[in-house]
Amino acid sequence: MLEILWANITPIQTFVSSNHLTMLYGLKRFGCRLYHHSKSTRYIDATAKVVSQEPAAISSTGAIPLNSPAAPLLSQDVLIVERQLEMMNVFLGYEQANRYVILNQQGQHLGYIAEQGASSILSSLSRQFFHTHRAFKADVMDSNGQLVLQLNRPFSWINSRLQIHSIDYSKFSSTLVGEVLQKWHLWRRRYELFLAKRSMFEQFAKIDERVLSWEFLLRNEQDRILGSVSRNFMGLPREFFTDTGNYVLRFTSTSAANGSVNENQLLQAAHGIANDVCARDMSLEERAVMLGSAVTIDFDYFSRIHGGPALGLNIPFMFGGSSSNHDYPAEDLSAQEILKNDQETTPSTNDSSSETKSPFLSDADLDQQDFWDIFDRDGDD
């Protein structure tokens, strides 16, 4: 049962982009108490406030303006994207719709990513037969359930492609922000990242890593590091038997090359050479495309292909091995480690006000409904 505290839901609105017609759920203010259920993360109270973040000072193409609802989410220095445990996938080999939780570096809840068509028969069949080749759309929402971005990945046999769209509620439309294009290679993991500018795409970064890499560095045309997407190792049982995983996204800023090598992960990736780090603020559009790259990397290299019920004995599509020999400092722990200590309270601020509130629920609330059940009622596109 979902305990509704307050809700003000706008009617379903239709947004038209140049490429497709998309039905978007106009959750302008969703004041329900929303719970995410996971054995590793316990329960997250989505009504807990998060740290207020000023929008990044750059909007390079105008696709994501500074007043966009996506700006606070994308203005974080570090994002942790955690894929959630799928129990039917573990025990029956049944491919479920992917769901992610987005956290900041302090473990505070920022939003969700939910694949559309969780209960649709056609989408379910597509997941079982085409697996990682399937087409899908996913909604990126803030902690209030408001839609801020959409991810659209068309069907592909070899090179995957994922497009990112921003949402403009004032014009009832969506705008193409950019795309992530996989480049096939026999022994390397390669991607090209583009921004949409008018009727053309402009590449701003590339990824070119070893075949077993778990760290994906974004490099610009001068081969300088622009950011990184790192998959954290979660333990052999979870890596082998489940599709869970979390990814740490680090965005560059004007101070990206500052500090010591032991404390700066981007500087570690550059082997201590500060000039190899591109010390500039990434635009909101670049950050959105980088967020999409984490999702498509998860699909391409860290999802599993199932041949039917296997009681969890599913062979990974491709194993990974860390490409970095550095031990990251304590503040860069995985989402599970950040969320383990449910006795701590998390300070949060909203504009000029501040309060201390734990993002976790007590054991008395464990019988409440899962947040994701809201999306199990959506239909196929």
Curated annotation (Swiss-Prot):
InterPro entries: Scramblase, Tubby-like_C
Keywords, comma-separated and alphabetical: Mitochondrion
Record GO biological process: mitochondrial membrane organization; plasma membrane phospholipid scrambling
GO cellular component: mitochondrion; plasma membrane
Biased composition (Polar residues): 344-359
UniProt subcellular location: Mitochondrion
Family matches, as Pfam families: Scramblase (PF03803)
Region spans: Disordered: 336-369
Major localization class: mitochondrion
An MF annotation (GO) of this entry: phospholipid scramblase activity
Protein family according to the UniProt entry: Belongs to the phospholipid scramblase family.
Record-given protein name: Phospholipid scramblase family protein C343.06c
